[in-house]
């Protein structure tokens, strides 16, 4: 009974974190729905950043209570930082190559690509750079790693099949069942590997944040 209860708590936590992760985007869509586009980025950015930081704070608080951030100081070890930067560079170029391959062979699912692109552009185009940075480099890494790494491993245990399950779900949520999934697999594998090797959530958060920032800038 205790086992079932503990697993139920983890599932509930994952769903709650997922709902939290959607709040800033829903709020931004609400702000955009009034039809007044004059100075919209200047109007949207401050409240979006405030809400996003509140969401991130709640997520971190929940993560601390769930034990997600144990041994977080290990992320600052120089060998770990070297590994993360090495994976960052390798993953970045592999991802670029895979996306180029998919694009050049016209393998993208057009309907999904348009839907996903519209959502991303809707969020980013109506925000100033600080808001875009907070969304891409802070909100997404912390919330997604808490869900697809910490919660998954807490729920299913530290097994090889958990590794593959985490990789798949992270990629699937971003792409659906289409060739697009290949574009997300390199990052998904790198993030899951970083977490799987010693279960330090801040490792995968750091790699995720750096990768998103790199894509955002370039």
UniProtKB/Swiss-Prot annotation:
This is UPF0177 protein YaiF. Its main location: membrane. Keywords: Cell membrane, Membrane, Transmembrane, Transmembrane helix. The chain crosses the membrane at residues 8-28, 48-68, 81-101, 123-143, 163-183. The gene is yaiF. GO terms for molecular function: endopeptidase activity. It is found in: Cell membrane. It is a multi-pass membrane protein. Pfam families: Rce1-like (PF02517).
């Amino acid at each position: 009974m205790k086992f079932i209860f503990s697993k139920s708590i983890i599932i509930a936590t994952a769903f709650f974190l997922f709902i939290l992760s959607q709040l800033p985007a829903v709020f931004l869509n609400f702000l955009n729905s009034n039809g007044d586009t004059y100075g919209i980025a200047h109007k949207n950015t401050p409240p979006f950043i405030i809400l996003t930081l509140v969401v991130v704070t709640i997520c971190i608080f929940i993560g601390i209570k769930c034990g997600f951030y144990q041994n977080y100081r290990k992320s600052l070890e120089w060998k770990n930082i070297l590994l993360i930067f090495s994976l960052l560079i390798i993953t970045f170029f592999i991802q670029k190559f895979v996306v180029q391959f998919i694009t050049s062979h016209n393998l993208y699912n057009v309907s999904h690509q348009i839907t996903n692109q519209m959502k991303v552009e809707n969020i980013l185009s109506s925000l100033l750079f600080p808001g875009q940075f907070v969304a891409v480099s802070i909100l997404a890494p912390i919330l997604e790693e808490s869900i697809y790494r910490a919660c998954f491993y807490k729920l299913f245990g530290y097994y090889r099949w958990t590794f593959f399950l985490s990789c798949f779900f992270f990629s699937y949520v971003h792409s659906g069942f289409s060739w697009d999934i290949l574009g997300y697999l390199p990052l998904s594998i790198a993030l899951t590997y970083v977490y799987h090797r010693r279960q330090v959530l801040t490792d995968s958060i750091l790699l995720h944040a750096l990768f998103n920032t790199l894509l955002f800038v370039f």
